Amino acid sequence: MKQIINTKFVKNILFSTLALFSAVSLVAQEEEEAPKFTLSGSIDAYYRANLNAGNGVDAQAPGSSFANLPGFALGMANVIAGYEGEKVGFVADLVFGPRGTDAIFASPMYSATGDIVNQLYAYWNVSDAVTLTFGNFNTFLGYEVISPVANFNYSTSYLFSYGPFSHTGLKADFAISDDFSLMLAVMNPTDLTEFNPVGQYAYGVQLGYSGQYANLLIDNGSYEIDFTGGFDLSDSFFLGLNAAYFNGDEEDGIGSFAGVAVYPQLATSENFTLGLRGEYFTETDFFGAIGASDAEGDASVFAVTLTGSATIGNLMIKPELRLDSTSEDTTFVNGNGEPIGSLSSFLLAAIYSF
């Protein structure tokens, strides 16, 4: 018997199927393109003690930034809110606590709440290869950053401490190819993040190739050249590198510095990594980073930091031993009040990220 096909019924089935696929596709597209709000951050606290110097009221610490308070001490609470659309978005990065205050030491200049703003910027993905960022953002120079989550060592290097922390201005990032990138920026003078009270501007350039970055900052008669990079030498061994030279403005009486730091890190298991930071830092013309200097204002320091990093879920525990040995025998004072040229210390930090 010849089968009779109901064409109207078939058309309805086809139409319904197409409509269903279109709806699913539209929903998927909307889900893919829908702006996303994110909330992340961290908290950290630590214990620090000198091994060859006092730990009382006049407790000393290395000349580098952060993690310099004696006994049980607070780092900071860091809350980062972000909104990411298909083309545009923003980041509001707020910090509360001693580490955050030290990081944005030049604020507040105007706002009563200026000392909590670490980053505050909007961005526009002009194309797949070009992004514009406008506002206050952390520096592009250097290996280390303000957040302890992104640093392997809890205490920081001299190179990081005396380079810029943050900038406010406009920067353009260009993805030249899969390997090459370029960044150009015009900004307020370094660390003047709330507004520009001097009417002068700084300029920045970064050239990147496969995770290695050459950086230049020109700022009101001073300039800094910086290299930051790293290499995975094996599945478990990483070597980070940072080198910089800063030439201060002689007319303003600003000295100069240069230094190099290496960061070998060995992962002994999925939850534990052992890392070393070896840094040599030298300064001239009474730059003032190290502390004591000779009659010409020159000084140097060799600092070695050994850090273990144990991960328990979102919690990191970092025990750390550090030795700072300077060129001058009067940089520090021991427990008997006698001048010494080196300082050894122990630190234990806890960092929780979310």
Language model features with spans:
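Surface-exposed coil loops of outer-membrane beta-barrel proteins
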Residues: 46-71, 100-119, 127-208, 214-216, ...
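Outer-membrane beta-barrel channels and translocator barrels
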Residues: 34, 84-88, 127-129, 177-179, ...
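Cleavable N-terminal export/targeting peptides
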Residues: 1-34
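Residue-level detector of the transmembrane beta-barrel scaffold of outer-membrane proteins
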Residues: 38-42, 89-91, 131-133, 181-183, ...
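Outer-membrane beta-barrel pore domains
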Residues: 63-66, 100-103, 108-113, 212-216, ...
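Residues on the lipid-exposed face of transmembrane beta-strands in outer-membrane beta-barrel proteins
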Residues: 41, 45, 70, 74, ...
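Short N-terminal segments immediately surrounding and downstream of signal-peptide cleavage
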Residues: 30-45
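Surface-exposed extracellular loop regions of Gram-negative outer-membrane beta-barrel proteins
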Residues: 78-99, 175, 181, 228, ...
